[in-house]
UniProtKB/Swiss-Prot annotation:
Chief location: cytoplasm
One GO cellular component, as annotated: cytosol
Domain S1 motif: residue ranges: 628-696
Job of this protein: Involved in mRNA degradation. Catalyzes the phosphorolysis of single-stranded polyribonucleotides processively in the 3'- to 5'-direction.
Cofactor(s) this protein cannot do without: Mg(2+)
SMART domains reported for this sequence: KH, S1
GN (gene name): pnp
GO molecular function, one term: polyribonucleotide nucleotidyltransferase activity
UniProt keyword annotations, A-Z: Cytoplasm, Magnesium, Metal-binding, Nucleotidyltransferase, RNA-binding, Transferase
Reaction equation(s) it catalyzes: RNA(n+1) + phosphate = RNA(n) + a ribonucleoside 5'-diphosphate
Protein name: Polyribonucleotide nucleotidyltransferase
Biological processes annotated in GO: mRNA catabolic process; RNA catabolic process; RNA processing
Similarity comment: Belongs to the polyribonucleotide nucleotidyltransferase family.
Disulfide bond sites: none
Length: 710
């Protein structure tokens, strides 16, 4: 069974009934030569006590899909790559909000790339395919949802740009939505305007609706009846009981200005509820079973009560938990150069969110090699985000970065990538690390701000400073409030998380997730307007600390020097088996990188004298003999017809016996000795570059110069 839709001259095909038939839902999504198998499976029984949708999404790229064999010793796919993690998150975000309340069945969706073409669409197909698989399955799902990518070339929007179009595009936007509205946005841009972004969403949604209609057609042909959700009763009764116990105390606890104090007060209220409600009498009344532990049910109901209080306070009273107005930004402090041995460092604090950001400059040896289905990619700019457990007062083991950390780091990296200088302008590999020391909302945007400060402190000539802010939304009926610089609580209990980063001129990165059925373009415009005001305010605050990149690099950063040589001279620098270049490195301690085709030699060292020494050695190796010039050369070999003299490193010339002296010489060894330093003049360089020397002309010229001086 399959349905199809033509997009840009190629068919989007959704096929079911052939692959993976033991799943709850399975769809093969095809476009051009790109095939993605999308499957969903849900457990048959629910899990009790969950306050979230137990959904796991995994995206995997099979090496065989691009005709490749994986590298490494084992020659098979290993742990998920960063790209696979990022696409997994991209699929998850528009799908998760569409599961109904009370859905407690563990569910897994897997998107496997089986064939990889040059359409640049595997991630988009995965979102469409997972949604289609859920739509035709028996799993309750308030979809379907669809996605497209939007590019922009010469001020025209392009739907699902291929690899060639993507290279020219100034916009890279993934938009997902339902039939009614856009629900997820992620992308980057070369300083685009807010108006352009809104128009891009409208353009995207027009095509999203066509793909949703295609999924509904597939559902009509092969959809299964949806299973009923077995929900546990008693939640409303528990909420009423909670209000009877602590109703008069919630407001005082919820509106304490500090996060730690607020959380402590709320924890005390929760404990009071647990002590009063997790009793035999209440359990018997609620479930007819006094042995049942209902602490999880009480905790979940308590969370809903607090959520309702916070939202009503914002919508009806205009009061946020920390006392701010809806468009007010928390206090900001910026510090730079705080770590003496680090090439660039900054501490950015916004309210109770704090990022310590460090910049390290390296050479081409430090570039990150990324294996992808499209081939090897070398990254010269990297940003890594670390969320440390103490930042929220927790005790957790330190492990490898999780999905959230990789996603936040990528968002911040994307925001800054548009202002990072090209390799020709700044020949360094740049690594930025953001360690979150405190967190109460918007740590990824604090990373963007801190990274900008750190890069400028390191002397990286970025095109413009970048700042970011997280926006939120509370929607109750017809009333909506857009929040600027949201707290963690406002993110958790709110209806939207919208992160916007950019320069003074425009937006460079954005990420939006809507937890409700969608938002209108009017609300979206308002959020963008508030975000721009906040961004400009933050940029101004950052400029008070540092307004442009430092002119000098850190004393401890490597200096990179470029030398242009003839490409044919590269082999002389390297030497047989790398002997010459290794010798230079051992003697000077520098790093040397050679671009063979261009004839560019890069020398890197934090010690300027060592770098200059290496430069002189390389210049000596690559310089060519100059006709008519006198050199002090070393006799390297004596032969019957003359001698070979090295006039510069790697350059030898023939000194014929007739050119040794004015008088006739019987044996060369009577006049010259191996290793002897003698003056010689270059008298000929033939077409093959062979050099002929004359000692007698050199002596004669030196004698004439001396006589002239006296």
């Amino acid at each position: 069974m399959e349905v199809e839709l033509e997009i840009k001259g190629k068919k989007l095909v959704l096929q079911t009934g052939i692959f993976a038939k033991q799943t709850n839902g399975s769809v093969l999504a095809k476009y051009g030569d790109t095939y993605v198998l999308c499957t969903v499976v849900a457990e048959k029984t629910p899990k009790e006590g969950l306050d979230f949708v137990p959904l796991t999404i995994d995206y995997q790229e099979k090496a065989y899909s691009a005709g490749k064999i994986p590298g490494g010793f084992f020659k098979r796919e290993g742990k998920p790559t960063d790209r696979e993690i990022l696409v997994s998150r991209l699929i998850d975000r528009p799908v998760r909000p569409l599961f109904p309340d009370g859905f407690n069945y563990e569910t897994q969706g897997i998107a496997s790339v089986l064939s990889y073409g040059d359409e640049n669409i595997a991630d988009i197909l995965s979102i469409i395919g997972i949604s289609s698989a859920l739509t035709i399955s028996d799993i309750p799902f308030n979809g379907p949802v669809a996605a497209v990518r939007v590019g922009m070339v010469e001020e025209e929007f392009i739907l699902n740009p291929d690899n060639d179009e993507a290279e020219k595009s100034i916009l890279n936007l993934v938009v997902a939505g339902t039939e009614e509205a856009v629900t997820m946005v992620e992308g980057g841009a070369a300083e685009c305007s807010e108006e352009t972004l809104v128009e891009a969403l409208k353009f995207a949604h027009t095509h999203i609706k066509k793909i949703i209609a295609l999924q509904k057609k597939l559902q009509q042909l092969s959809g299964k009846p949806k299973r009923e959700i077995i929900s546990l009763n008693g939640d409303e009764e528990i909420q009423k009981a909670i209000l009877n116990i602590i109703g008069g105390k919630i407001e005082n606890a919820l509106f304490l200005p500090k996060k730690v104090e607020r959380q402590q007060a709320l924890d005390e209220l929760l404990n009071e509820c647990l002590q009063n409600l997790n009793t035999e009498e209440f359990r018997q009344k609620l479930y007819g079973n006094f042995d049942k532990d209902i602490s999880l049910e009480i905790t979940n109901a308590f969370d809903k009560v607090i959520k309702k209080f916070m939202r009503e306070s914002i919508v009806k009273k205009g009061i946020r938990a920390d006392g701010r107005k809806s468009d007010e930004i928390r206090p900001i402090t910026c510090m730079i150069g705080i770590l003496p041995r680090v090439h660039g460092s900054a501490l950015f604090t916004r309210g109770e969110t704090q990022a310590l950001v460090a910049t390290t400059l390296g050479t081409s040896e430090d570039e990150q090699k990324v294996d992808s289905l499209e081939g090897e990619i070398f990254k010269t700019f990297m940003l890594h985000y670390n969320f440390l457990p103490f930042s929220v007062g927790e005790v957790k083991p330190l492990r490898a970065p999780g999905r959230r950390e990789i996603g936040h780091g990528y968002l911040a990296e994307r925001a800054l990538s548009y202002v990072i200088p090209s390799k020709d302008e700044f020949p360094y590999t740049i690594r930025v690390v953001s360690d979150i020391l405190e967190s109460n909302g918007s740590s990824s945007m604090a990373t963007v701000c801190g990274a900008t400060l750190s890069l400028m402190d390191a002397g990286v000539p970025i095109k413009a400073p970048v700042a970011g802010v997280a926006m939120g939304l509370i929607k109750e009926g017809d009333k909506t409030v857009v929040l600027t610089d949201i707290l963690g609580m406002e993110d958790h209990y709110g209806d939207m998380d919208f992160k916007v980063a950019g320069t003074e001129k425009g937006i460079t990165a954005f990420q939006m997730d809507v937890k409700i059925s969608g938002i209108s373009y009017e609300i979206f415009k308002k959020a963008l307007k508030q975000a721009k005001q906040a961004r400009l305010f933050i940029l101004k605050k950052m400029a008070e600390t540092i307004s442009e990149p430092k002119k000098e690099l850190s004393l401890y950063a490597p200096r990179i020097y470029k030398i242009q040589v003839k490409p044919e001279k590269i082999r002389d620098i390297i030497g047989t088996g790398g002997k010459v270049i290794k010798g230079i490195i051992e003697e000077t301690g520098v790093k040397i990188d050679i671009e063979d085709k261009e004839g560019i030699v890069k020398i890197a060292s934090s010690n300027e004298s060592a770098a200059q020494k290496a430069i002189e050695i390389i210049k000596g190796i690559t310089q060519e003999a100059e006709l008519g010039r006198i050199y002090m050369g070393k006799v390297t070999r004596i032969v019957d017809f003359g001698a070979f003299v090295e006039i510069m490193p790697g350059v030898e010339g023939l000194l014929h016996i007739s050119q040794i002296a004015d008088k006739r010489i019987q044996k060369v060894s009577e006049v010259l000795k191996t290793g002897e330093q003698i003056p010689v003049k270059v008298i000929e360089i033939d077409e093959l570059g062979r050099v002929r020397l004359s000692r007698k002309e050199a002596l004669r010229e030196i004698e004439n110069r001396t006589a002239t001086k006296t």
